[in-house]
């Protein structure tokens, strides 16, 4: 397994709409394994393929067990996700490996039902609530070319853009 480079905002790659996965083969398995290594190394709870510059509809979610411990047992590999139902709303603080060091409150659906395939092409339907629901929505947004900061209201979005420019300037000085 390899740790892959994560594409960061404002790279235009993140705006691409990902294509459906058609082949469930060893190349897909290697990508998923490398994505898992990358996500864990970067302390993430989710990672979409587009975040490692691969524009396919594949993502990982691992919110951990009851104690927050992540492992292959708590990993959900999601290929070609499709939301079947959604209801309620909740606000939670989100962050993103593609927008490092920035966190803000985003409103999402509280409950979702998602149809997807695993690495072997087996179909699954899962109901998710709370953090898992947020993770499904956040990662699927990536597949559609959207970042969580686009869901911020106008004032928060302007604040983000100002803070982001400041962070970039600080990083360039180092």
Swiss-Prot record:
* BP GO annotations: co-translational protein modification; translation
- What's its EC? 3.5.1.88
Among the GO molecular function terms of this UniProt record, one is:
metal ion binding
The record's catalysed reaction(s) read: N-terminal N-formyl-L-methionyl-[peptide] + H2O = N-terminal L-methionyl-[peptide] + formate
- The answer, when asked if Cell wall biogenesis/degradation is one of the entry's keywords, is no
Residues bound to Fe cation: 96, 138, 142
What is the similarity comment for this entry?
A: Belongs to the polypeptide deformylase family.
Stated role: Removes the formyl group from the N-terminal Met of newly synthesized proteins. Requires at least a dipeptide for an efficient rate of reaction. N-terminal L-methionine is a prerequisite for activity but the enzyme has broad specificity at other positions.
HAMAP family found in the cross-reference section: Pep_deformylase (MF_00163)
What this protein is called in its record is: Peptide deformylase
This chain is encoded by the gene named def
């Amino acid at each position: 397994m390899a740790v892959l480079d994560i594409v960061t905002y404002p790279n235009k790659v993140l705006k691409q709409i990902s294509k459906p996965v058609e082949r469930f083969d060893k190349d897909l398995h290697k990508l998923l394994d490398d994505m898992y290594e990358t996500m864990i190394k970067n302390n993430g709870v989710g990672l979409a393929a587009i975040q490692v510059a691969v524009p396919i509809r594949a993502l990982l979610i691992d919110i951990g067990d009851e104690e927050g411990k992540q492992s292959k047992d708590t990993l959900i590999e999601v290929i070609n996700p499709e939301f079947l139902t959604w209801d309620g709303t909740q606000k939670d603080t989100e962050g993103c490996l593609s927008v490092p060091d920035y966190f803000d409150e985003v409103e999402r659906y509280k409950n979702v039902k998602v149809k997807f395939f695993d690495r072997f092409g087996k179909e699954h339907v899962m109901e998710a609530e709370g953090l898992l629901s947020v993770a499904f929505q956040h990662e699927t947004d990536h597949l559609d070319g959207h970042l969580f900061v686009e869901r911020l209201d106008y004032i928060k979005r302007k604040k983000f853009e100002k803070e982001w420019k400041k962070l970039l300037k600080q990083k360039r000085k180092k």
